[in-house]
UniProtKB/Swiss-Prot annotation:
It comes from Mycobacterium tuberculosis (strain ATCC 25618 / H37Rv). InterPro entries: CHP03843. This is Protein Rv2133c. It comes from the Bacteria.
């Protein structure tokens, strides 16, 4: 399980490296649905690894016809920043080798480096034998594995995941897979791949249903209230041009709905869990 620790902070010089550095493509991330590249951004003597998703490599989606996936990724980052939860790695829009696209700081995880090992124990979202559920984890669904054995999909009862679950409700995330939840070497839990979010219609699909029907605590609600206020001013201005005006309005209504009824929603509608789940 992911250790606790301080969140990744980005210094001004690191932002400059991402925004103004020379991008070198190191390789393509083949597991991604759209063109996604691991890059190195270099400015002077500083280099940072990052993910680059050019708009030119986005596949058209009939249910997300407005704007770009890159714009939605940046919008999700701006919402996360306003909430103060640091859930989304630093994200910008800039030019790159394949044109304008999203650039996001790479999250280094335990075991990524050749001289480091993965953390012991289960992942934050994992499968367990149905007859032996994991203490400290919340059940989401039961299914059968490839061997025909019954298993249960569970996620950790962790405040960092709880904030992410609220964040997903707010941005109407249609693609919160287990593999989109990363535990950095700094101990922070990060969410990535937010191209399918912020739609006007309810499209929430997530593996983080363990708190459905549970009350939302006051500290989280305070952050949501700050988001609702910001959506009446500067945040709405920052989102304009990235997502449609109707989607900004829907985001504000979702925030207000959580404040009016501070209970985590339950699955409602078709396909409440993304597939594959990881």
């Amino acid at each position: 399980m992911c250790c606790s620790g301080l969140a990744m902070t980005l210094r001004d010089d690191e932002h400059a490296v991402l925004a103004d550095g020379e991008l070198t493509v190191l390789g393509r991330i083949r597991s991604a649905s759209n063109a996604t590249f691991l890059c190195e951004s270099t400015l002077g003597l500083r280099s940072l690894h990052c993910v680059y998703k050019p708009v030119s490599g986005e596949r058209p989606l009939w249910d997300f016809p407005d704007g770009t996936l890159a714009g939605r990724e940046l919008s999700a980052y701006l919402v996360s920043t306003q909430l103060g939860w640091n859930l989304v790695p630093h994200t910008i829009i800039r030019d790159g080798p394949a044109g304008i696209g999203m650039l996001q700081l790479w999250v280094q995880q335990p075991g990524d480096a050749v001289d480091s090992d993965p953390l012991p124990g289960p992942d934050l979202v994992d499968l367990f034998p149905a007859h032996r559920p994991r203490p400290g984890y919340l059940p989401v669904l039961r299914a059968y594995d490839y061997a025909g054995d019954e298993v249960v999909l569970m996620h950790a009862d962790d405040i960092r995941l709880r904030r992410m679950a609220v964040f997903d409700v707010l941005i109407n995330n249609a693609d919160r897979k287990g593999g989109h939840i990363l535990c950095g070497i700094d101990g922070q839990v990060y969410g990535v791949d937010h191209g399918l979010c912020l739609h006007v219609e309810n499209k929430l699909r997530t593996v983080l249903w363990g708190w459905a029907g549970k009350p939302i605590d006051d500290q989280i609600l305070q952050a949501v209230a700050g988001l609702a206020d910001a959506l009446g001013g500067p945040l709405a201005e920052a989102l304009a041009g990235r997502i449609a005006a109707a989607e900004i309005g829907a985001l504000r209504r979702r925030a207000q709905s959580l404040l009016d009824q501070p209970v985590m929603p339950g699955p409602n509608g078709h396909r409440p869990i993304p597939w594959p789940a990881f």
